[in-house]
Amino acid sequence: MLRNMVQTARKYKKVILVSTMIIGIIVLSFIAILLRFTVVTDYAAHHLFKDPERSIPVGNVIVSPADGTILYVKKIENGVIPEVVKKNVSIPITDHLKTTPLRPFENGYLIGIYMSTYGVHITRIPISGTIEKQIIFNGPHMNMTDAEIRIILTQMIPGMVTLRKIFGLMPYDIEDVADYILKSARETTVIADTRGKYVYVVRIADYYVGKLLTWIKEGSKVQTGLKYGYITWGSQVDIFFETSPGIDIRVTEGDVVYGGETILATY
């Protein structure tokens, strides 16, 4: 009988030992996952969800809708953009907006703002007015990583953007990796501004952008600098605005701009 008790004890001891090892592995794995999740959430809190205070300028101004780098400043004539992706290849404005303008867009400007992965991803209203329309284009979410790498490498060399422009080149060598500008999914927000003109803000989705978050709706009255949305991981925001007497563009390609604060144009 004693022998049976000892054998039973040994058997249960083995079961307890194995069970303890399994539980230990599970607990350690859970701790490792938790620590990894903490690192991820800490990264997200410090790098992705930045929302700094901004000094909103007053007066007859159009401010940047996003933080980033000016990729291009294009003058639009007769509804045609002289070039965006391919040098010397013009495109109609509808190819970019993925919709027909609310009225014929004859003359105006297009300014493209590339947002850094590590920058502020809040988007802001560029000019006071009323939200006339919001259009979603459910195209592919194209990868912008190659474009961002080339932009960063160019910015690391002092004077390179200026030098490229002097030689008649695009400020950033992204021509062969910039198809996302016209093909990627996007949201176009149309603002009827205080001039009686239309301003089109186009938020372009990156491969890593799950959704373009929007906190306004059609018919909303909005003020310059108002936070109206968020783009995960950064991406690109382009702005189209019609010309008007006395309009003056205040930025150039290669400039760093801050959403709600940097003046793109005065009128």
Question: Whereabouts are the PLM-identified features?
Answer:
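Contiguous, well-folded functional domains in the mature portion of proteins
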Residues: M1-Y267
